[in-house]
Every structure is written in C-alpha cells, then in structure tokens.
C-alpha cells in the first residue's frame, strides 16, 4: 500500500447529500486521513440528486457522498458514473401513527405524510422511496394509501411540516428516520420497523472520467474511508470529541451520534439485497434502468485489492 508521500497532492470539490454523512468526513478531515492520501477536499451540501449528478458530469465536483438510486438509470444512458464503496447497507425506520398499528399492512386506506417522489429538479427523494418499499413489502399497493406530500425534498423544513401535519390531523401516519421522541411526547404511537436492506449513507460516488484524471484516485478514496472507519470504531473517546465539535459548528448535524460512525462497515462492500432494493426503486421511476445490470454501477476492485492485501484485517488485529 502506497504511503502519503507516494501520492501526487490534489485538491477536489465534493458534495455531501445528507448532513448525516458528515461524521465520517469530519473524522477523515480532523484525524488527518485526507492528508494521509494527499487529498484536500472542499465539501458542500447539495440537496438534489439531479443537481449533484450534473455537477459530477460537468466537472464542478469530483466526488459525491451519496446518490444511491438514480445512478443505475444514468449507467443505462451511457453516463460514466460509478460507485466505489458502501459503508451502510440498511435503514431501520419507524412508523408513527395516530392510532396504534401492529404492522405496515394495517395502514391500508390511511393518509401518509411524506415528501414527493421527486424534487423540483427531478431528483429522486430516496427517503420517500424507502417508505414506498415498506408499503410494498407489507403486501400493499402504493395506491392503497393516500400520500400527503408536504415538501419536495428531505430537509429540516420537511421534518417541521411533517410533525405539523400529524399534529393538525392532516395525516394518519408517517415514516420517521431517527429520533421519534417528540412524536411520543405528543401522544402518537410509534412502531419500530424491521431493517430494510438499502444502499444509503456516505457512499463513494464519482465518475470513470475522474478516476482516470487523478493519480490513483479510487485507491485513495477507498483507503481514506477505510482508515476513517477504523479510527471511529477503535477510538471512541476521540471520535466523540470530534462529533461534539461538529454538532456545535453544524446545526443540521446536531442529531448525529457515535453510532452513526461506529456502525459503518470495516470492509464497506455493498450488500446484494441493498443493491437490489436501490435498483428496484430506480426502475420504478426510470424503467430504462432495467436494460443494464445493477452491478454495472459498482467498481469494487479498489476495495477488493485493499482487502486482499490483508491491510484491513491487520488494522483490526488485537482489538
């Protein structure tokens, strides 16, 4: 494995698609792992998958943290988008309802508060897609519930509108990712749902063009992420201090916790069921994605080479 001095220093622009991704990037920055691979990263938030992809293709950014659904359709269109690693492969949402329910199947005929399927720019709202899969997996059709759409994208504004809609009885139920304490305090029923395999979180998304542009770019990205994950999993006290600093600086990240990085996979391979579900969501919106295998999006050889070298196993020896 190359040492930091072996890499040509580069500076890149990047987007993160959710503030929940920030913890691992904070660790890479503050613990020196970007420096170790000689990359300076200028991260900015982007709330639309279509805008992030446009920036990738026109060269405004070289990396996107996220974009989990629409890339499969872009591959079918001949675009050079590629994903290199998936540190998280599942979601565990909760169903909040006005009346207690024992399963998602019991919301037939109910009003469900959510985002639109697509934002104003045409980008896919991944969270809404997850909720659609929960409905389908329960044996219902998407038309068996009434979708009350209160925002065109996942945001703090949506979360405020979501809670308001439930309080004002504009909806009967809603799916919530993360903390549901305010709903419980308001007297709503909360049902923990089973884990849904799904590509999500700080996925490394770039293009074949960029991989060819910079010296060993894919190798460096994967190595830095693997090192950051190892640090988080083995240096809890230092990681929690970094996250406290992040929460003080970024209001949108105030809900992050140590578990948000401790749960990341030591070997961030995508799970096959998670890929299948992400691909399924894409095909629902863009049937042309069916023309190519979902595996065409993934280039895992950088991770496989790192893994095969024994580097990752050696990191965790003696834990």
What are these regions (language model features)?
Residues 2-149, 175, 190-198:
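Short, glycine-/small- and polar/acidic-enriched structural segments
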Residues 23, 29, 51, 55, ...:
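Extracytoplasmic/secreted proteins, especially bacterial periplasmic and envelope-associated proteins
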Residues 31, 55, 59, 110, ...:
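Structured segments of extracytoplasmic/periplasmic soluble domains
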Residues 69, 150, 154-246:
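Pocket-lining segment of extracytoplasmic ligand-binding domains
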Residues 89-95, 199-204, 208-209, 278:
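Small-molecule pocket liners
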Residues 101-105, 208, 212, 267:
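Proline/Glycine/Serine-rich low-complexity intrinsically disordered segments
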Residues 214-291:
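Secondary-structure end/capping motifs
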Residues 283-319:
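Conserved C-terminal helix/tail region of periplasmic/extracytoplasmic solute-binding proteins
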């Amino acid at each position: 494995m190359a040492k930091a001095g072996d890499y040509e220093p580069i500076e890149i622009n990047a987007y993160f698609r959710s503030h929940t991704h920030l913890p691992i990037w904070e660790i890479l920055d503050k613990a020196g792992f970007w420096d170790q691979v000689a990359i300076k990263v200028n991260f900015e938030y982007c709330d639309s998958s279509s805008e992030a992809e446009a920036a990738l293709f026109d060269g405004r950014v070289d990396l996107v943290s996220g974009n989990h659904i629409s890339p499969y359709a872009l591959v079918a269109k001949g675009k050079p988008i590629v994903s290199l690693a998936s540190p998280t492969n599942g979601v565990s949402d909760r169903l909040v309802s006005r009346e207690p329910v024992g399963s998602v199947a019991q919301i037939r005929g109910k009003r469900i508060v959510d985002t639109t399927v697509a934002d104003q720019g045409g980008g896919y709202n991944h969270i809404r897609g997850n909720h659609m899969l929960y409905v389908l997996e329960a044996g219902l059709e998407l038309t068996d519930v009434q979708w009350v759409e209160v925002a065109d994208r996942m945001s703090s504004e949506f979360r405020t509108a979501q809670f308001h809609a439930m309080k004002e009885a504009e909806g009967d139920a809603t799916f919530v990712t993360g903390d549901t304490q305010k709903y419980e305090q308001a007297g709503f029923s909360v049902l923990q749902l089973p884990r849904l395999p799904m590509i999500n979180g700080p996925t490394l998304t770039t293009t074949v063009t960029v991989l060819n542009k910079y010296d060993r770019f894919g190798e460096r990205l994967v190595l830095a992420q693997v090192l950051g994950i190892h640090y988080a999993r083995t240096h809890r006290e230092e990681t929690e201090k970094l996250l406290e600093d992040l929460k003080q600086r970024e209001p949108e990240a105030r809900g992050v916790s140590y578990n948000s990085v401790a749960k990341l996979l030591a070997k961030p391979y995508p799970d096959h069921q998670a890929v299948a579900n992400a691909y399924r969501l894409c095909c629902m919106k863009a049937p042309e994605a069916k023309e190519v295998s979902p595996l065409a999006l993934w280039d895992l050889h950088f991770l496989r080479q790192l893994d095969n070298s024994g580097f990752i196993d050696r990191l965790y020896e003696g834990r």
